[in-house]
């Protein structure tokens, strides 16, 4: 062969690698330019005119800043035409998620991360929206009005939520994805990422967000879906751009699609003996296990196919002590659980958050899995798992006697009677019931029997009639409680606070944000400061009665304080905040948004004196 041919091959490979590198390192701006290229090369004929539509309805979401019975700061604001755009600033008519930055990860209530979570999975929250007409998407525009840059993934679903007949198959496809990236723009923007063409029409779009790099809450105003009724024909140039995007190994659906193959890979017994296994059999069994601990679940599936020795190691139940299935929510189903079942008999941490919706996991499939794999479970994450019902919680209570950590956050379809089963889990130390329909009777039973609770989240639990009764029971029974979330509890008073403060003296974190019935004039906040010296986080968000006396008591008694939110108070002066900052050396977050006495000049002066403290002051244009 002529020497020129290998040289041509090398040059061709180098050129291809450059193309891939260029696609991987493209900025959002480059992608938007790429989007314009695609649009210009896929012009539709009049017979296939583009349909432009705003979201008709918000059908599911993981969290929001607002309450369950109003529209302010709720995800439901994403339905319909924009309310705020193109204005910028903090507006109640927008959709806002519950958290931002890394502040919640630094709190005493934060859970440890799961091992084996693929680096490509960075989503923290999601919202799903439906549209009137099914179309082949050509563009998805997100109107961001405050602290943009949280959206990191956009998906489309093949199921039509408005169809009277359930589909035989439900598919999710990633239209666009990117790792979290700091966006310097502070003004409102219309985010227009370059999306991938898919081969089915959709009217169900899902946005996934990561707010860890944001300086404050992101606010979304509307979502616009562009598409055609018939599948568009793209030019060769467009196809090349899309292919480069699809081949980006850093953040694509490769791992997300592995659950399709997972069922086959683990069940395959037709492994060739082969003459060699790379001398792995010379290594101690424990060392191989330690090495394999660093592999993601899909990589473990792939490795299991290489030789019998590694198949044995990859199927060892010790590899599944911690099992995080949340990254694979779009593909995980009953069959997946069935093939994982034999390998999960020793599982202690299990994350099924976001999984099983739209029929992917059945009650019987979940029950079968737990009956085999539940005996050793210590931690079970089930956030937004809408397949759960009364039977599922009964199975959890019977099959998981060692359970210490249960997260049912945003399982808002669980019937109230289901929560009574939780009282049987007497070893519970952490219970998250945020945005659930737990009722007072069931909760009182839980508190009575689960006396070892250390972390309890009751944020936005709207079915509880009297939070004073709940607070009294917490104070009487939960002496080891360290963190308590009462965000937007509607009727707690100074009486409940008194019982809580006297009974739970170990509290390190207390969220009383948007609790309108608490009044500083009753002395409730002074009592908290004097009786809870270990407080590290205190949120008194939107309580307009918080005053200088309360702040000064915190400065005198709660010197370990790290995070304080007093958004919306009219009664706090810069002088009292200075005392607080001087006394609380560990304070790192202070939110004084909409505090009428704390103007921008005061914030600048405090920032200059205490540069290590992040002082937040929101604004409305």
Swiss-Prot record:
CDD domains: F-box_FBXL4. The keyword Nucleus applies. InterPro entries: F-box-like_dom_sf (IPR036047), F-box_dom (IPR001810), Leu-rich_rpt_Cys-con_subtyp (IPR006553), LRR_dom_sf (IPR032675). The modification Asymmetric dimethylarginine is found at residue 28. One of its GO terms (biological process) is autophagy of mitochondrion. GO terms for molecular function: ubiquitin-like ligase-substrate adaptor activity. Substrate-recognition component of the mitochondria-localized SCF-FBXL4 ubiquitin E3 ligase complex that plays a role in the restriction of mitophagy by controlling the degradation of BNIP3 and NIX mitophagy receptors. Also rescues mitochondrial injury through reverting hyperactivation of DRP1-mediated mitochondrial fission. This is F-box/LRR-repeat protein 4. It comes from Mus musculus (Mouse).
């Amino acid at each position: 062969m002529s020497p020129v041919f290998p040289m041509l091959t090398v040059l061709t490979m180098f050129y291809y690698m450059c193309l891939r590198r260029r696609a991987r390192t493209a900025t959002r701006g480059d992608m938007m330019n790429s989007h314009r290229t695609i649009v210009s090369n896929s012009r539709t004929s009049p017979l296939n005119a583009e349909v432009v539509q705003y979201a008709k309805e918000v059908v599911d979401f993981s969290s929001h800043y607002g309450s369950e019975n109003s529209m302010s700061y709720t995800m439901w604001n994403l339905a319909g035409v924009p309310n705020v755009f193109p204005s910028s600033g903090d507006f109640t008519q927008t959709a806002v998620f519950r958290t931002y930055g890394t502040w919640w990860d630094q709190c005493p209530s934060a859970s440890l991360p799961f091992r084996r979570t693929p680096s490509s999975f960075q989503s923290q929250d999601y919202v799903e929206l439906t549209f009137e007409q099914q179309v082949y998407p050509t563009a998805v525009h997100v109107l961001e009005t405050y602290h943009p840059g949280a959206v990191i993934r956009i998906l489309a679903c093949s199921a039509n939520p408005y169809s009277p007949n359930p589909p035989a198959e439900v598919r999710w496809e990633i239209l666009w994805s990117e790792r979290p990236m700091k966006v310097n723009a502070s003004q409102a923007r219309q985010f227009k990422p370059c999306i991938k063409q898919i081969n089915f029409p959709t009217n169900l779009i899902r946005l996934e967000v990561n707010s860890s790099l944001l300086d404050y809450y992101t606010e979304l105003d509307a979502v616009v879906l562009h598409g055609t009724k018939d599948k568009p024909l793209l030019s060769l140039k467009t196809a090349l751009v899309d292919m480069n995007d699809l081949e980006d190994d850093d953040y694509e659906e490769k791992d997300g699609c592995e659950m399709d193959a997972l069922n086959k890979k683990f069940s395959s017994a037709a492994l060739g003996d082969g003459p060699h296994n790379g001398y792995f059999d010379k290594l101690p069994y424990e060392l191989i296990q330690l090495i394999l601990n660093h592999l993601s679940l899909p990589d473990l599936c792939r490795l299991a196919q290489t030789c019998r020795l590694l198949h044995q190691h990859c199927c060892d139940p010790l590899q599944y002590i911690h099992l995080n299935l949340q990254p694979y929510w779009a593909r995980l189903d009953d069959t997946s659980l069935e093939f994982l079942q034999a390998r999960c008999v020793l599982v202690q941490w299990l994350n099924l958050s976001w999984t099983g919706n739209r029929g992917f996991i059945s009650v019987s499939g979940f029950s079968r899995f737990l009956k085999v794999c539940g005996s050793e479970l210590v931690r079970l994450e089930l956030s937004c798992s809408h397949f759960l019902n009364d039977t599922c919680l009964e199975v959890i209570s019977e099959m998981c006697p060692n359970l210490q950590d249960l997260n049912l956050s945003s399982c808002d379809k669980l019937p109230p009677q289901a929560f009574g089963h939780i009282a049987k889990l007497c070893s519970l130390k952490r219970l998250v019931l945020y945005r659930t329909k737990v009722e007072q009777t069931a909760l009182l039973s839980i508190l009575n029997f689960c006396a070892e609770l250390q972390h309890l989240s009751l944020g936005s639990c709207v079915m509880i009639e009297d939070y004073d009764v709940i607070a009294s029971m917490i104070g009487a029974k939960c002496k080891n409680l360290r963190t308590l979330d009462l965000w937007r509890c509607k009727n707690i008073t100074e009486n409940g606070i008194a019982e809580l403060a006297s009974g739970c003296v170990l509290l390190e974190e207390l969220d009383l944000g948007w609790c309108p019935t608490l009044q500083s004039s009753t002395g409730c906040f002074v009592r908290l400061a004097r009786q809870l010296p270990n407080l590290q986080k205190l949120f008194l968000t939107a309580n307009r009665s918080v005053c200088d006396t309360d702040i000064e008591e915190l400065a005198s008694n709660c010197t370990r304080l790290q995070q304080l939110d007093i958004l919306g108070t009219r009664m706090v002066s810069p002088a009292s905040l200075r005392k607080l900052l001087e006394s609380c050396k560990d304070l790192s977050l202070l939110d004084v948004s909409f505090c009428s006495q704390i103007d921008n000049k005061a914030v600048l002066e405090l920032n200059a004196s205490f540069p290590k403290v992040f002082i937040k002051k929101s604004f409305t244009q």
